[in-house]
């Protein structure tokens, strides 16, 4: 009997049931086409739902995503955290707003994955003026919410993913971490297979929960050890390119950040604020910089930054683009796009704006 190859073993390992008890298949490149990913960052659905302004922001955010999806027709979508602003959602089931944020992608039959930001499970913050003579305004709950669900209680990270998976029509690739990594929840890896079954995988996509909200903004030592074990098992010879996604930038982003203007080798269009990094560094960047297979890290969190800069001449550190009309800042909205080509292997990225324009294209593959 012929022994399976290393790549066949990797595919088998990544097809085992996840913590949620379901089996998630692998992604696959379409024959003759590159594999394209759209990143939606910082949508911040559910803000000020007791006003006319808040729901209007969500409509605008849907329009941004729809414009990007129709222009780029991606194979996959990554929701890069702060999908909702839970500290502004005055109902128990924040997943109803999470579902609204996912809907443009799901309605087009495009698979996706999500990870958490610092606002997704934050506790509800009571506006002080509600406790004055004006009183608490009537809550505007989504139609799917009953009276019991229209209360002042948050929704946990685990509950959000569980509800997402239930309503995903099998399009969600999101997973729940092993419990030993909790309270960090969105830690998992996805494999992008070649269109040719006889060829090795094209890429490994790692998703990490950078915390915030219900616990500190940090990638823990336990997560670092999980990544080391997972990556060394799946990619021991560093032959498969790896891309990393999390929400809050690491401190390494501060080291490469442009001082004022974005100049080469960095590429981007806005540099309007300082990098707001994780609270502590527990060795994740040291692990990544020592893996030649890691090509780039993608984060959100800072709405006024959209650049990519090389780090130690080994990998790229990239911000996405603020996609949602929720959250701070009035910079034009858009989405970072990734394109992975097989033959020859190449990773390109650019930013697609709501108005249809494209800018800041850069090759993330070192020759």
Curated annotation (Swiss-Prot):
It comes from the Eukaryota. Fe cation binds at residue 303. Keywords: Glycoprotein, Iron, Metal-binding, Secreted, Signal, Zinc. Substrate binds at residues 301-303. GO terms for cellular component: extracellular region. Gene3D superfamilies: 3.60.21.10. The keyword Phosphoprotein does not apply. Pfam families: Metallophos. Residues 1-21 form the signal peptide. Glycans are attached at residues 93, 290, 363. Coiled coil: none annotated. Zn(2+) binds at residue 301. One of its GO terms (molecular function) is acid phosphatase activity. InterPro entries: Calcineurin-like_PHP_ApaH, Metallo-depent_PP-like, PAP14/16/28/29. Expressed in stems, leaves, flowers and siliques. It is found in: Secreted. Binds 1 Fe cation per subunit. Binds 1 zinc ion per subunit. Its cofactor is Fe cation; Zn(2+). Homodimer. Belongs to the metallophosphoesterase superfamily. Purple acid phosphatase family. This is Probable inactive purple acid phosphatase 16.
